[in-house]
Structure formats: structure tokens, C-alpha cells
From Swiss-Prot:
Compositional bias of kind Basic and acidic residues: 161-171
Cofactor(s) annotated in UniProt: FAD; (6R)-5,10-methylene-5,6,7,8-tetrahydrofolate
Molecular function (Gene Ontology), one example: deoxyribodipyrimidine photo-lyase activity
Protein name, per record: Cryptochrome DASH
Gene giving rise to this polypeptide: cry
Keywords in alphabetical order: Chromophore, DNA-binding, FAD, Flavoprotein, Repressor, Transcription, Transcription regulation
Organism taxonomic ancestry: Archaea, Methanobacteriati, Methanobacteriota, Stenosarchaea group, Halobacteria
GO biological process, one term: photoreactive repair
InterPro entries tied to this protein: Cry_DASH, Crypto/Photolyase_FAD-like_sf, Crypto/Photolyase_N_sf, Cryptochr/Photolyase_FAD-bd, Cryptochrome/DNA_photolyase_1, DNA_photolyase_N, Rossmann-like_a/b/a_fold
Keyword DNA-binding part of the UniProt annotation: yes
Domain Photolyase/cryptochrome alpha/beta residues, every copy: 2-136
Protein family (similarity comment): Belongs to the DNA photolyase class-1 family.
Species of the source: Natronomonas pharaonis (strain ATCC 35678 / DSM 2160 / CIP 103997 / JCM 8858 / NBRC 14720 / NCIMB 2260 / Gabara) (Halobacterium pharaonis)
Spans traversing the lipid bilayer: none
Keyword Flavoprotein: yes
Binding note for cofactor: Binds 1 FAD per subunit.
Amino acid sequence: MDTAVVWFRDDLRVTDNPTLADAVAAAETVIPVYTFDPDRYTESEYGPPKTGGHRAVFRRQAVADLRASLRDRGGDLLVRSGRPATVVPELAQRAGADAVYAQTKPATEERRRAADVASALDDAGIALRQRWTHTLYHPDDLPTPPTDIDDTFTPWRKETEAAATVRDPRSAPETVPTPDGLTPGPVPTVESLGVSEPPTDDRAVLEFEGGESAGKRRVESYIWEGDHLREYKTTRNGLLGADYSSKFSPWLAAGCLSPRWLHREVERYEDERVANEDTYWLVFELAWRDFFQFQFEKYGATFFKPGGIRERNIDWDRDRALFERWADGETGVPFVDANMRELNRTGYMSNRGRQNVASFLAGVLGIDWRWGAAYFEARLIDYDVASNWGNWAYQAGVGNDSRDRYFDVRSQAERYDSDAEYITTWLPELAALPATIAHQPWQLSEAEQREYGVELGVDYPEPVVDIDARYQSL
């Protein structure tokens, strides 16, 4: 093969990237391209933009880092702005390419984009060769095909762990033979994408920087320098600080890190330092991530229906004003509000927080869970279609769980933030309150409000619902 185009999507790395590796192995010249698709920066059908400021910054950093890595190997990355179905086929035709190599993903919009590109390429007699690059287990290695897998995680995990193996990560190509004379193109600014620059906040748990280089530095810091993997399961439900959890998710979501490469790092750590339940638990969480990817392969667009894959007939509330109170962190329920304010200011929220705010929106307020999932899509720096929508459906009782479930945010706050350090970090207006009262300020008497200088409805909102009565009714 003379020329291949590599269309980068959510696989912004050179290490363990079968899309890039196969193109380099097959073609004499390789033209890598990334296109900033305007459809990813427009408003979703639920209102918020699909990509907010924090993720837009992370994405452009990741693209710039990928370009640097390719240039280190004698190649380059062409950066364009436009819909892939236009940009990629036009580039391939002008270059006289024999094939275009690209990542494949299971979600609906991602599939549609690939189909549109494939159709335009087919008209020009050019093949689209897709590679599965973003999970720990390859779908071809599963004991049961994704379309037939169990809808419950534990049976699927046990079957998969017993019968499947994780493929070895592939090395980065030593050279990428990109021809001379191409116009690389600038990496667009956040503003030119139609996105506002995100706020900065010194309370953020970590300064997330996009790119494979930064992702590997985070792995080095967390696993090797900090030696935190040995206590991962024990600390993973924390709320404050850089190292209570791995925080690898932004780099996994953008494809800056490969799950297989990360698995190899865990194995190396277990060989060189310690193997215990904590080290296994990171692989366990990667399996959870896989599970939702394969569930999307099975159910596709059904995940986006109000009743989810369980096709439940639930009359969801669509009170926009109430939803905005939740989104802005103004519900009057501190554990919910603190988490939402952290998300809005930093683009990140702990897993414990995500479960609680989702359960509160769908279970306590009864608001259409898809509004919450779309809001997370806009705000999260580590947004992944399958993980986000799969977890939201799970918490709303319409996904991969046959049980109706909810989190009691009162007891969750007391358990995971017993000293109220987290909520007072993000809700400083409650800092004068004793911890037990700070978690449930709606119980303050008028005299106590005067004593502590916290007036409900003025300094901090009254709760949007009678929280105690609502939990009694669930």
C-alpha cells in the first residue's frame, strides 16, 4: 500500500494504538489527521453544549501532545476543523490514499460519524479500516459476544476473567513516515470552537493536562512515585486531594492512555512491589468501564430512551427550574450542592459524588435522568459516552440492574465526609456550623441560625424538597 490516512478520534496516543500501528505497518507513507468536529461543540437536544470548557481545553492539549509525539517520530498531525465526513474523504482523495484507518466505538453518534465517513470514502473507492482500541478486553476475545452478554456486571466479569486474557499492548511506532509538503494546520483555540474558557479554582483536586505525555506522568506519580496503588480500594471513595483515587479517567476517555498499557503497569507493580485486593481493584474498575462499552455494543440507542434498556414506563418530571437548582448546586442539600459546585468549577467530581447527585436528581427529585446525563456530558473533563450514560441509567433504575436503588445523601455525607471538610470546602458559607449540622442545615432552628450566622434562604438555600419526608417515602 502506498498511502494510508489515520483518522484519530478518541485514541489520541501513539503507544498501544492499533489504528496507527497497523497503518504504519501497511503503508509506505502515513498521513495522520484529527478534525475538530463542530457537532461536538454545539448544544445537545437537552440544552447544554456537548463539550464544555474544561474538556475542550483538555482535548486541544491532547491533540497538541499527539502532534509533538508524531513529530518526534518523523511524522506530523494534520489538524482541521470540520465534519469528518467532509474533511477525511477530501484529504484521502487529494493524497491518493488507498485506505483510511480509524478507531471504532459503539455509541450511536460515533457509529453514525464513522458510517458517514465510510460512505463518502466508498464513493471514492477508498476503504475505511476500523480498529477496536479503547477497552481492556478485545471483543473478539470475550467468551460471549457483546451482543449476547449478561446485562448484570458480576456474572459478565466472572465469566470474562475466567475465559479471556488481556492482549499485550503494542509498542509505539519508531517512525511515522508522513510525506513532506502538507499543511499541518493550527490547533484551534477554545474560543474558536465556540466554547468559553473554563474557570480555574485552587480547590481542584488535580490540574488535569491533556495528552499521552501528561497521562503517563500521572501514572508515574500515582502508581510509582506515590506508591498509592497498594491502597487504591481503601481510599477510592475519598473526596478531597489528588491521590484518593487514580484519576486516570480523563486520559482514558480521550484515548491518551490505553487500558491495556495501564493493565501492564499494574502487573509490573504487582511483580515489583505488592499484589493485593487494592491493586486488583484498579483492574476491576477497568472491567466496569469495559462492561458499559460492551453494553452499548449490545443495546445502542436504547440507552438514551427515558425508560432505558429496561424499557420502564416512568413519568419523569421535567421541571426546568428545579433542574437548574440541582445543576447550580443550590438544592439546599449540602452534599449534593458541594459536588455540583466542584463539577462546575473544575470539570471533575469523585465517583462517590457522581452516584449521589445522580441518585438525588432521578430518585429524590424524579427529574428526567437524561437531563443529568447530558449536563455531565457538558461539564465532565472525563466524559465517556458509555460510562456516563450507562452509569446514569444504572442510578436511575433503568439500566443494568434489576433492583430499584437510591443513595441516601444524608447518610452518605455522614459516612464519607464525617467532619464536613468536603462540603465546607465547596460551601464555605456553612463553615461555622458543626459537622453534624452542616450536613443537614434545614434542621437549624431560628435561634441556631442566629447563633451560627447562617440564615436559611439567605446565606444558604432552603431545601428544594422535604428531604426527610421524601426519603421516608422511597
